[in-house]
Amino acid sequence: MDPFTEKLLERTRARRENLQKKMADRPTAGTRTAALNKRPREPLLEANHQPPAPAEEAKPSSKPSPSKRRCSDNASTPDAGAENKQPKTPELPKTELSAVASHQQLRATNQTPQVSLLSSDKELTASDVKDASSVKTRMQKLADQRRYWDNNVSPSSSPPAHVPPKDIIVSPPKPQIPDVGNDTPVGRRGRFANLAATIGSWEDDLSHPFVKPNNKQEKPGTACLSKESTTSSASASMNSHSVKQDTTSCSQRPKDTTVNKAVCSGQLKNILPASKPASSVASTEVSGKSKPLAIKSPAVVTSKPNENVLPASSSLKPVSANSSPQKTERPASRIYSYQSASARNELNNNTPVQTQQKDKVATSGGVGIKSFLERFGEKCQEHSPAPLNQGHRTAVLTPNTKSIQERLLKQNDISSTASLAQQQKKEREKELAALRGRYDRRNVWTKQEDEQQGTFPETSSNLPTSDVASCSETKRAEASGITSEKSVSGHFHPNMAEQVSSPEKIPTPVQSQLPLESPRLVNEGNTGNVACEVEMSVDGSIEEINSSGIITNIFSDVLEQHDEEGEEVDECLVEQVETDTDDEEREDEEEDALNISSMSLLAPLAETVGIESPKALLSPSNKVAAGNGESCDRKRSGRFQKSHVLRAESNDGIGSSEENQNLLYSIDAYRSQRFKETDRPPIMQTIVRKEDVSSRLQDKKTASPLSVNIKQKMKTLSNEVNLQQTVIHQASQALNCCIDEDHGKGSETEAEAERLLIVATEKRAALIAELNKIKNEGPQSQKKNVSNESAPSRGCISVSEMFLPLKADFVCNATQRMDSANYYFFLMIRAGAENIVASPLTSITSTMKGDALAFPTTFSLEDVSNDFEICVEVYSLVQKKEGHAPDKKKKTMKSKAITPKRLLTSITKSNMHTPALASPGGPNAVRTSNFVLVGSHKLTLSSIGSNKFPLDKVPFLSPLEGHIYLKIKCHVNSSVEDKGFLTMFEDVSGFGAWHRRWCVLSGYCISYWTYPDDEKRKKPIGRINLANCTSRKIEPANREFCARPNTFELITVRPQREGDRETLVSQCRDTLCVTKNWLSADTKEERNLWMQKLNQFLVDLRMWQPNACYRPASKP
């Protein structure tokens, strides 16, 4: 025997001994009342309805009697001889449980005198005297219990003071048990029939504690119960046990030995049929025919589940009623979704007791889910002292049980602890809703409140009683395959917790898919059904099915309450449940008994983790569903769309959760992320370079000069030539009309026409020259400009604030002789054929500022290279005014009457006086402008920094002084930047040291810090100004002087300062201090990249700002 089994057996023995001591210490009713608040530890066997037996070790019994098997499954039997006597002790509790259950459900059936119970108690006492001393003690306690119970049932009975608290619950089974021990099986059946009749005569007595003593006695398994007694107790326990009790047994069950596990699995298969017939049939029938009922029961919704259930039940025929409380409870829990209205009412009547137990559980464990060990410890403490608690307690606080508790707590006063726990749960759910709402674009809990008038936890807690039953009934009516269960399902609602604890093992097809499928069935029927199914599927912690997936599906169902696809989806799901039952049962047997998830409260967040679809949660269920047909797939996909944030429109979209893979998987992670971002915003930095930045830099260079298609460019130039030709033609026509003063001769309008004519003419000539150049050279001219690797970055040039000074004597004479002539000037700025701009027309009379003409035009060029050339040209026009004699003649001529002959003569005379005659070609002839070029200047990169430039080609008699004033600015579009670690060589007290620095290349300097984070928070340790660099080109350091690999050298110069001295890195020459900067990169590639970027910086700096940096020394 392995050490684990030995320890398990030792603990079981210790618990039994402890139970015996406690049972001996509390013989009075007062002691029992006090014990209600505390439960002793229980063995690791199935604990749903059976607390461990005090005296005996668990030994599997080989006897065929059903009672014996039941005892062996739950606990070991001490002696073969005591078989009849000891079973009585467990039988009493079972009968008590059955009595309580039937009392809840069949209270109006039959009313049998309680004298028979008393007589049975006496018989039991007599048989107990013959047993060993331990047996005698237990039997005396049982007798006291019976008496006390009899007193409670009928107020006229003897006072219950001497009766132990455990015996209070079950009186009817007790009379039968003594008979069972002494009589033949036939007598047992008769007594069981009497017991059923007695149970039927009972009336509701909420103050009467039930079930707990039965559980304790049953668990020890000291004696074997008769078939009849076992069956009756099992059926009664099925009916009497509350959902909480069932949950408790399930939670403890994982710790049971392997024998118990096998029994549980078998029981689960048989549970549904056995429990359903037992509840549907009268208690009298249960005593004798529990086996066949279990086999014949129509409880299974689908054909496949029925097949699975029948063989299981047949294998356990002696325990047809599933004497073990776990077995009975599990089927009940599956059927729980289909409870009838009568069952609801009975459960509501028993609500006070359940409420007390649930309050207790909530106080100890809280609403949240605890680990299996914690829940088992609490159950062991609460089991023995309070039979009341055993009858209806929920030791396992699974989400199902929790929701049921909340419901009952609402109906009766909720304890302060439970209220606080519920409030915390709601807060967590709100946070979950906020997280999910970011993608759902709606508030999940708001929709639930609109539909259910409450949050999900409240609804689920309210549903376990009558609401659940009504929901289940409505659902059954809708589903085609579930109609057969209507009659039976109503009686098994107390056992719903069993299904919660082990949904996979339960044979009912609807429940087999607890995590996902069963909730859908219920939701389709009614809104109440949603909560009902929720509770059934929440406790998936024991199975392989992830509890988070179950709760996720539950939440999705709550969101889908108003779907109109109920009936069709139900049919599809029923078919799926049939095929899924077998797989889930096999998986459940292989699962870890302690696999209880403590994160089930955070289950809704499972959607935002890597879970792609329901496939990740329920692989078998989804596989089956996939083959159910297009209609079923369509509806299921619609449901999954709601349950998952992806909200895909088809099944194909369900599986892709790439959008949610980066989401946080828990509330704690979300909070820590939020606080972290608030306290310290992240600084995005790239420490390791994974891409070839040099290639990116080369791409920028190549792409900077816009490469235009040659044909497209030629077409554009041709269009522009045609446009300028049109302007020339129109300007010529205007000038041809200016024949005298009346027609604009000598006016500013004529001068403007002359300006348009000269500008259009110059543009046309430049465009034609460019077009011919492209035709002759082709695209080779562009390639030459781009091919240079060390070409500097391109920049922007702007020319503004242009002034044209005039001679001082000319200005004085012009002001004195204003009527002599008009002088017009304008500037034409050229930067290639495509960039020609003309300034507005200016004259001495209109735009004179002092002794200079001002031109407000601003000329800008984008994306130009450093070898740009801008030509500024000055054009002048002189209009001489005519004498007054012609005006007098015109006046005298106008006074005469106008005749055709006179008109012709006047036109001829006026043409004679026109200084600029029209072209001989007529009014449509093309003219040549009278503007004359009087000065020009070319601006280049070297012009930057100056504002006065000489004019070329200025005539001697021109009024221009010979200079032009303008402001030229340039901006380099250099985007070369880099960051990374470099190891710098420094002189430390006369010794060379290499220090690793975080270097940033920006703004024509290299700034360095110790750590990357310091860049945003601290001033740099130092800077290397590239403007002071005298290296013609940055190259690797000479290995003769620097042996460190991947090192490059950067030489800088600065004016010498006082206190400068020579070091390992600096030397003083004349008035300059020369510094050698050795910078070492981590890899050769990084070194080459740094060198390339630094060289680009130097080229840009020296080309665009030649006066702002030191020029490299000329080579000798």
UniProtKB/Swiss-Prot annotation:
<dbReference type="GO" id="GO:0000281">
    <property type="term" value="P:mitotic cytokinesis"/>
</dbReference>
<feature type="region of interest" description="Interaction with F-actin">
    <location>
        <begin position="255"/>
        <end position="418"/>
    </location>
</feature>
<feature type="compositionally biased region" description="Polar residues">
    <location>
        <begin position="336"/>
        <end position="356"/>
    </location>
</feature>
<protein>
    <recommendedName>
        <fullName>Anillin</fullName>
    </recommendedName>
</protein>
<dbReference type="GO" id="GO:0005938">
    <property type="term" value="C:cell cortex"/>
</dbReference>
<keyword id="KW-0498">Mitosis</keyword>
<feature type="region of interest" description="Disordered">
    <location>
        <begin position="443"/>
        <end position="522"/>
    </location>
</feature>
<comment type="subunit">
    <text>Interacts with and bundles F-actin. Interacts with the non-muscle myosin II heavy chains myh9 and myh10, and these interactions may be enhanced by the phosphorylation of myosin II regulatory light chain by mylk.</text>
</comment>
<feature type="compositionally biased region" description="Polar residues">
    <location>
        <begin position="453"/>
        <end position="472"/>
    </location>
</feature>
<feature type="region of interest" description="Disordered">
    <location>
        <begin position="205"/>
        <end position="257"/>
    </location>
</feature>
<feature type="compositionally biased region" description="Low complexity">
    <location>
        <begin position="226"/>
        <end position="242"/>
    </location>
</feature>
<keyword id="KW-0131">Cell cycle</keyword>
<dbReference type="InterPro" id="IPR011993">
    <property type="entry name" value="PH-like_dom_sf"/>
</dbReference>
<feature type="region of interest" description="Interactions with myh9 and myh10">
    <location>
        <begin position="142"/>
        <end position="254"/>
    </location>
</feature>
<dbReference type="InterPro" id="IPR051364">
    <property type="entry name" value="Cytokinesis/Rho-signaling"/>
</dbReference>
<dbReference type="GO" id="GO:0003779">
    <property type="term" value="F:actin binding"/>
</dbReference>
<dbReference type="Pfam" id="PF08174">
    <property type="entry name" value="Anillin"/>
</dbReference>
<dbReference type="InterPro" id="IPR031970">
    <property type="entry name" value="Anillin_N"/>
</dbReference>
<dbReference type="InterPro" id="IPR012966">
    <property type="entry name" value="AHD"/>
</dbReference>
<comment type="function">
    <text>Required for cytokinesis. Essential for the structural integrity of the cleavage furrow and for completion of cleavage furrow ingression. Plays a role in bleb assembly during metaphase and anaphase of mitosis. May play a significant role in podocyte cell migration.</text>
</comment>
<feature type="compositionally biased region" description="Basic and acidic residues">
    <location>
        <begin position="85"/>
        <end position="94"/>
    </location>
</feature>
<dbReference type="GO" id="GO:0032059">
    <property type="term" value="C:bleb"/>
</dbReference>
<keyword id="KW-0539">Nucleus</keyword>
<feature type="coiled-coil region">
    <location>
        <begin position="416"/>
        <end position="443"/>
    </location>
</feature>
<dbReference type="InterPro" id="IPR001849">
    <property type="entry name" value="PH_domain"/>
</dbReference>
<dbReference type="Pfam" id="PF16018">
    <property type="entry name" value="Anillin_N"/>
</dbReference>
<feature type="compositionally biased region" description="Basic and acidic residues">
    <location>
        <begin position="120"/>
        <end position="133"/>
    </location>
</feature>
<feature type="domain" description="PH">
    <location>
        <begin position="975"/>
        <end position="1099"/>
    </location>
</feature>
<dbReference type="GO" id="GO:0005826">
    <property type="term" value="C:actomyosin contractile ring"/>
</dbReference>
<dbReference type="InterPro" id="IPR037840">
    <property type="entry name" value="PH_Anillin"/>
</dbReference>
<keyword id="KW-0132">Cell division</keyword>
<feature type="region of interest" description="Disordered">
    <location>
        <begin position="1"/>
        <end position="188"/>
    </location>
</feature>
<keyword id="KW-0009">Actin-binding</keyword>
<dbReference type="GO" id="GO:1904172">
    <property type="term" value="P:positive regulation of bleb assembly"/>
</dbReference>
<feature type="compositionally biased region" description="Polar residues">
    <location>
        <begin position="304"/>
        <end position="326"/>
    </location>
</feature>
<dbReference type="GO" id="GO:0031106">
    <property type="term" value="P:septin ring organization"/>
</dbReference>
<dbReference type="GO" id="GO:0000915">
    <property type="term" value="P:actomyosin contractile ring assembly"/>
</dbReference>
<keyword id="KW-0963">Cytoplasm</keyword>
<dbReference type="Pfam" id="PF00169">
    <property type="entry name" value="PH"/>
</dbReference>
<feature type="region of interest" description="Disordered">
    <location>
        <begin position="304"/>
        <end position="363"/>
    </location>
</feature>
<keyword id="KW-0966">Cell projection</keyword>
<feature type="compositionally biased region" description="Basic and acidic residues">
    <location>
        <begin position="1"/>
        <end position="25"/>
    </location>
</feature>
